[in-house]
Amino acid sequence: MPTAFVLLNTEIGAESEVVKALKEVEGVETAYNLWGVYDIIASVKADSIDKLTHIINKQIQEIDKVHSKLTMIISETGTPPT
């Protein structure tokens, strides 16, 4: 199942509002406030890569007060080789 981590920058003071909105988006599994360069991290899963990119580029990016995002799509799942 395609999965991505999305780092978001928001309008100052809007972090909790954006986290609440993220939790309403289908496919968003978790969303947390951060301290540092980015304001929020979210984990997103979908049935296909097309659906995943739609969620990120349309639903998440268009949340009010989201200024920018950095998306990291996981290339494979499972345990690392030993």
Predicted regions and their residues:
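A compositional/biophysical signature of low hydrophobicity enriched in polar/charged and small residues
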Residues: 1-82
